[in-house]
């Protein structure tokens, strides 16, 4: 989904890795605009010129960070590969489980969920790139299953609303976690709790899809 890293300047290079490790904390805390590359370089224990050498600019560092964490997310929670004969409900459940893990798992090495939430709230030039390389492939997988569920006659607008309703259930736990923890003091997203959340979203979504399908049939009866 994302381009392969240049081996000569990969995330494994000690200086590059040090910069990425510090940059994730700075960009998440301060946002892209307020983040200072001088602070990142100082905290990483490298010269400021190292950012230009490895990334070209502040913008290049930020985009590389997004791509690095998106790649980590794909590797740790890849899209499920299921036989087409597997019942559609099970395939949707597997897709939602992977999406939830990719975006919300606090134990994942990827921080792409929080990065993308920040990017959506305060867009930069990186948004178009990340939309094409990270967001759109996931949406297209979901739309493919929804098209299979609804059939060819249902307008794309209906599919998009259904897809956004499913994705929105996942994202709200990342965006509104300070509110959720006040509503539920023992709220947790680790291990089995994350699995239960994914199952809930899948069950809720499947019921909603069935209601939408009945509505569509009624409109065309």
Residue ranges, per PLM feature:
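N-terminal intrinsically disordered/low-complexity leader segments
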Residues: 1-14, 214-221
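Helix-turn-helix
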Residues: 18, 26-60, 64, 68
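Short hydrophobic clusters on alpha-helical segments that form packing/core surfaces
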Residues: 19-27, 166, 205
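Short secondary-structure transition hinges
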Residues: 73-84, 103-140, 187-195
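Hydrophobic alpha-helical connector segments
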Residues: 78-112, 159-166
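N-terminal hydrophobic signal/anchor transmembrane helix of membrane proteins
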Residues: 89-105, 109, 195-216
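Hydrophobic/aromatic-rich alpha-helical bundle segments in the mid-to-C-terminal region
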Residues: 111-113, 127-136, 145-202, 212-221
